[in-house]
Amino acid sequence: MDFFDFTKDFRREEAPSGFISSDPSSMATEMFESKPIKREVIGTDYVAEIAAKEKLLMSGQLKAEIPGQYSGGMDDLDSNDDMDDEEISKIRLDEEYYKKYRFNLNRDKNLPIYAKREVIVNAINTHQVVILKGETGCGKTTQVPQYILDEGFKSGQYCNIVVTQPRRIGAISIANRVSQERMWEPDTVCSYQVGLHRKQHLEDTRLLYCTTGVLLNSLIRNKTLTHYTHIVLDEVHERDQDMDFLLIVVRRLLATNSRHVKVILMSATIDTREFCDYFSTKVSVPPVISASHGRKHSIEKFYRDQLGSINWKDDPDDGYQARIPDEAYKAAVKIILVVDNMERQAANQSEQSYDDAKSQGAVLIFLPGIYEIDNMAESLGNMTKEEPSMKLFIVRCFSLMTPDAQRDVFSPPPSGFRKIILATNIAESSITVPDVSYVIDFCLTKVLVTDTATNFSSLRLTWASKANCRQRAGRVGRLRSGRVYRMVHKLFYKTNMTEFGVPEMLRLPLQNSVLKAKLLDIAPPIEMLALALSPPNLSDIQNTILLLKEVGALFPTVDGEYCEVDGDITFWGIIMSRLPLDTRLSRLIILGYVFNLLEEAIVIAAGLSMRGLSTEAGRGRLTSDAYWMNYVFADGSGSDLVAIWRIYRTYENMVANGMHQESAEPWARRYHVSLRALKEMHLLVQELKSRCSQLGMISFNLSSSDMPDDLEKAILLKVIIAGAFYPNYFLRSKKTTLEQERDIFHVISGRDPCRTVYFTNFKPAYMGELYTRRIKDLFQELKIPPESIEVTFQPGSQKVFVTFKSDECDTNCTRLINVPGQVLTEVYKSIRMRLYQSNRTFRVMDHNNALNYVQRHGIGTLKEGHWTPPSRPLNVEMLALPSVYEKNMTGLITHVDHCGKFFFQPKSFARCIQNMSEIINTPMHLQYEIQNAGVLTKGMMVLAKRKGTFERAIIVRPETQNNRQPKFFVRFVDYGNTDLMYIEQLRLMTKELLSQYGDLPPRVFECRLALVQPSTMSNTLSRWSRDAKDMLISASKNNIVEIEIYSLVYNVAAVMVHTRDGLLNDKLVEHNLARRADENFMSRQDHDFRIRKQESARYISGPERQQVNEEYLRSCQMPEDLDLTPPPLDKCNMIVMLKGPYSPLETSMFSTIRVGVWKTVKIDNSSVNAVLLDSDPQDNHDQLVVSHSTVESSNGDVLTARGTTLMPNIHGFGPLMTMLFCPTMQIKCNKDCTKYVSILAGLGFDKETMKPYFEEHDMVMNLDVNLYEDDVRMINQMRYNIDTMFFNFEGEELPSLNMNDRVTIYKELRKLVNRLLSKDRSYIELNASNSDFNWEKEDRIEPQPEPFGKRCIFPMHVIPELLEEDIGRRLYLIDNCKKLYKWRNFEGALDILNCKLCNMSLETTPQLRLHLLTQLHRDREKQIGFKNE
């Protein structure tokens, strides 16, 4: 019976088998149909015709459509093409306004821009568009708008100027600086407007600084430029999407209804030729004005080929790949050494000392990312070890750095140190450090690129542009002459590196730009984006439109007809365009409104859009403490998004309670949270609430009786997360075959995988039992106390097994961190510890010294050179455990912790318990009252008072030992309960009692309910609820209870509790307090063993049965932790490299969408799900994980899921969410049409060509539980209700429903969600097919009526009709079942049998027997009406 022997290796040959899994890559052979076809990239050939037409329009040779005429318009036009109105606007006088405020015409003449003042003013007066190129610091941003305003003052003409800034902080600070310079009251003549800081009263404002997005949204809303006389677009070189689209809008409106508005383009590094061509017409070319100023200090530039011996050799196969080899880091270190030596020598010939030169000679090293910063810091650290005289003050500088780190960047270094700043491209322009004298530029950058066909983003390492490098070089020479070292060859820099970077419109998602084009309503999105300065590929626009249809922003149709490259905008699309968020985050807010979780959705969306909420974010890996703070905030939800909500709520509560900065900072440091990011997040939350309110989206006012409780709210929150981020769905891989289940336990030699981890590479010759305490010390950094750890070994194995004990009275802080499922938190912490450090050094004695040590100290026994560790004697016949031959037992349930842990006292022990109690409670045995609490130690047996009499008890721990009367937690040995007792309620045991009862095992045994697990609908952590506990207590109140023993594993009996109304286990399922579940492999194996022994009991004599039972009970005992005193460290002369710890429950995920099926999936290192374990190992059903976003590796092979949420372990949850939130789907039946077996979801397909519209995002969910026609009807009802919530009549801006109707829909949705998720669904066999991704014609199926026609976001699903199982097929399956049971007790070699019910191949008799015990097979038997006689 090697199958059950965990000490032996287990191997098998692969054979066809069925199992419960949705993993397409593991269930089907790789065929052409199973992989997506690579979508053809269509370039920019479409642009030429559209651009030529636009040039004619700009020259006045072609009449333009009035904005809004393209599709009838959604907003009333504020302006039209009436030239008289523009003439009036142009000559409007504003003399009264100029008298109201002080206008001083004296400008700063020291600024370089002043020399060009007259040229600039004249050019603006005579040209529609002017291009101004001025170096950073010349004064263009503050002065040019003032020059224009001064001209207006002189002529008395109306002037209204708007100036855009790429960053919020820039708009605010510049507006304040101009107001201060002109001595205007803030927010009068000059003001600012940014997304999160909006001034309410701007009537008197004539000079407005705003972010690019604010102006863009204003122009889209008004569809004219004539609200302003002058539009100044600053920093146009940055080329973000908002700027590029703003240029499209400005150019179009200049050519249509705003010909007299003046536009000024400004930048330090503008490509003047490109912008001139863009705004040129046949009759007008924009003038270019340059304003520059010379530098006070010179800058020398050096390239790699000029570094002499510092240069390194290239790999001939490298081909100038964008990367930093190890030699390049070393070269940078050598440059610093050269610089230092150069300054040391110069100090001898200069008045400036060497120390002064160092303090002013900071080195700024530009690196592409955090990983490279860490590598550079490590190289510098190694150098300082070799050169102690080199004292370096190393500072990291990146976008997510903490405020303390920012201060270090600007602060002078400690005396005698040189400051080395390791920076990303944030230091190009956002940060200026005056004391930088040297720049080492690796000429690299990281850019975020999104594949529009997959919506996967990837951070790619690429060569920086020359413009980037010039900006970086400009960081030196502020206080003295400087040097720039570019770590590329000069020829490569000049010929291979591009002049400018790739604009966002060519590398980032285009959703927001397309939505803006739809709102502007001038032309279809393709025609609008073709007018961009750098038009995107046509395929990118097409893919973006598909993505917008997927999220519900666009209808699939235009005027009722399907259009591949366009779609009418939905009200969801309008909402998404008005919220400053990614479309999926806006979708989260929309669904939050639908399910009355608007507050939660807004906070989560704001948090996900913020960078740097965690102070450790952006680093290569989170520190242990920072990572576990995420767990604290996630509170067992398995969701990064819930953690964001709880962080914000904690911060908000502290602010409301008057928390000051002094107390806020320690809190933020403790929980590794950025206060700055939280404050920004708070502003964004307020902004989102305001915008939602304007859109009619406010929370419903419900009575207290209608409010969902916390449990229902937690499930609804995960429902809307699943809806918002469809199709970012992943399934957690399961151990789906019997062999895989067995392997879980084989790896840890039969121990409990939910509480055990293991190390490897520890040879038996090391005699590990000597070092158990030292192994426990490895977990000190996790704050796991040694008394909560058991360390054991397996003879002949190189593994060290570490098992964690659970104790409800334990004060271990680890227990304060909740995790979902059955796995202990300590296991998660241990695996996370390995991710930081996979190998741990461990000191041991060599084998000979160890043998001498144990012999000298009398530890264990030594025989013929073989050491046997000491062991405690065990009389298994004294254990109060059920015999292998006992199926049913009667007795008392003495104590209930919950349905997964209660204690049973067999009726046969009643007399023993009574006699022992009588002896214990005689006066002579109660005479030792405890005067000094110090005599009590953990684990000591005492007498404690229980219900008026004293009983045996074990000291668990003291509750307190201060000035108050001491209390102790004690566990009653013979009853199982733990209570807190005063010291006077305790007695020391007499010697007589100790000798008589001290070694007597407990007269109870621990039980749990078999074949059921807690319902997720009653507890999101998969813990047993109070209601379930009350039902068990109620069933045990009538004293004697009958239980049926299913199995005995780890001395815990899995039982069924009989009541007058049937099995309690079944009653809990009926009341939705439990769900039916498989037992784990060990339990099923034990159950099978017990059944066979019980069947053969009548053929075995009494003594033989007793011997078999003793052997059985002895085999149930696990090795003990000996807790020996370890040898002194000075005697441990060998170093062992321990590997681990590992868990057999470590698992992975796979993507459900077609484009991701064959890719490896990882979870972001900072996620609470980064340690992904199979938290319910006995449950062979898929569990859904949803990510906020997905990042693709540079080679495209690996996906990283970010912002993940582990969905509730409700069977069928993934398919139900897919059906509820997908654009459309087909539910497929088995070949007999008797059950639904899979779901194909996506945007649908062309009914003529049968090709999918968006095959990359088509998703397959194979069903492992039964779904019925009624389920699909409920899903359709919910989809209809969601659409109804946003229904509006033509011409109405907001939805038509009043608040009462919305509340009614919300209540109906809640009721339907509860009905769907509360069903106890029977298991079905897997029906995998290579055609799962093929859309099929549904001509024979009656389509569902569509209340909203083709203008619905969630159309009704077609419902295939299910047929009854054919009687012939049923008889065939019943006959197959009989055959399986016939072979069940066969002991010889077995030919492969097939279970036709479950599509399972069975190769051995043990496999057959254990398969027959699975919930899948039992459910299938029930479905065909089979009963084993």
Swiss-Prot record:
Superkingdom of origin organism: Eukaryota
Residue span, Tudor domain: 933-996
Entry GO terms, CC: nucleus; P granule
Stored Pfam families: DEAD, Helicase_C, TUDOR
Chain location of the short sequence motif DEAH box per the record: 234-237
Subcellular location(s) of the protein: Cytoplasm
InterPro entries (UniProt xref): DEAD/DEAH_box_helicase_dom, Helicase-assoc_dom, Helicase_ATP-bd, Helicase_C-like, P-loop_NTPase, SNase_OB-fold_sf, Tudor, Znf_C2H2_type
Residues the record lists as binding ATP: 134-141
Keyword Transcription attributed: no
EC primary class: hydrolase
Entry keywords, A to Z: ATP-binding, Cytoplasm, Developmental protein, Differentiation, Helicase, Hydrolase, Meiosis, Nucleotide-binding, Oogenesis, RNA-mediated gene silencing, Spermatogenesis
Catalytic activity: ATP + H2O = ADP + phosphate + H(+)
GO molecular function, one term: RNA binding
Entry EC no(s): 3.6.4.13
Residue intervals of the Helicase ATP-binding domain: 121-288
Family named by the database record: Belongs to the DEAD box helicase family. DEAH subfamily.
PANTHER family, per the entry: ATP-DEPENDENT RNA HELICASE (PTHR18934), ATP-DEPENDENT RNA HELICASE TDRD9 (PTHR18934:SF113)
Function recorded in the entry: Probable ATP-binding RNA helicase which plays a central role during spermatogenesis and oogenesis by repressing transposable elements and preventing their mobilization, which is essential for the germline integrity. Acts via the piRNA metabolic process, which mediates the repression of transposable elements during meiosis by forming complexes composed of piRNAs and Piwi and govern the methylation and subsequent repression of transposons. Involved in the repression of LTR retrotransposon copia.
Protein name, entry field: Probable ATP-dependent RNA helicase spindle-E
Organism: Drosophila ananassae
